[in-house]
Structure formats: C-alpha cells, structure tokens
C-alpha cells in the first residue's frame, strides 16, 4: 500500500482486536476535524463503505486531548501528514493500549464510529 495512513486504537480494551477497537484510515480520507468538547477532538473520515448513498455520511474518531489544545493537536496531525514518510507511511495518532501518541497533548481515543 502506498501513501500515508492514520492509526487509532481506543481505550475500550487492552487488546484492540474487535470491531471499533482500532482502525487505520488513509490520510486522503480525512473530511475534517472539529472540537467536540474542551478536551475532545473529533476527526471525520469519508466512509470506507462506498455503498452509502448519503453524501454527508462520515465515519469518525474521537480523541481525548489536553484541555483547549485543539489547534495544537490539529497542527501536529497535519505536520506529521506533511512530513517525510517514515515507518512506511504508518502514522500512529492514538494507540491507547500501548501508550503511543502523536502529540503530548493527545491522551486518549474514546470513540471509533464506522458505517456498516
């Protein structure tokens, strides 16, 4: 696979091995990001299932962040996407079970919502 991909693993389980526990998205599927609360950022993605006929259907991942650091976290994600490719284009944004985060302002991943 060519390109860059964003990886998320939630804190729902110590082993992200089921539906909704972890997900990998190509960066070109990002549809936007928005604050969800003072300590939460929602990242929207174009759906992986292309059989959806609703134009505004999106999948999303909610990450927990340091309070009011939305812009800094969005900057960090975009900077990593735009940087030279490392690790085969695999970008870990939030891997809660392994305590790996793209930025020190990212502290969790609470919701992975996919279309079925």
Region locations from a protein language model:
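Eukaryotic intrinsically disordered, low-complexity regulatory linkers and tails enriched in Ser/Thr/Pro
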Residues: 1-116
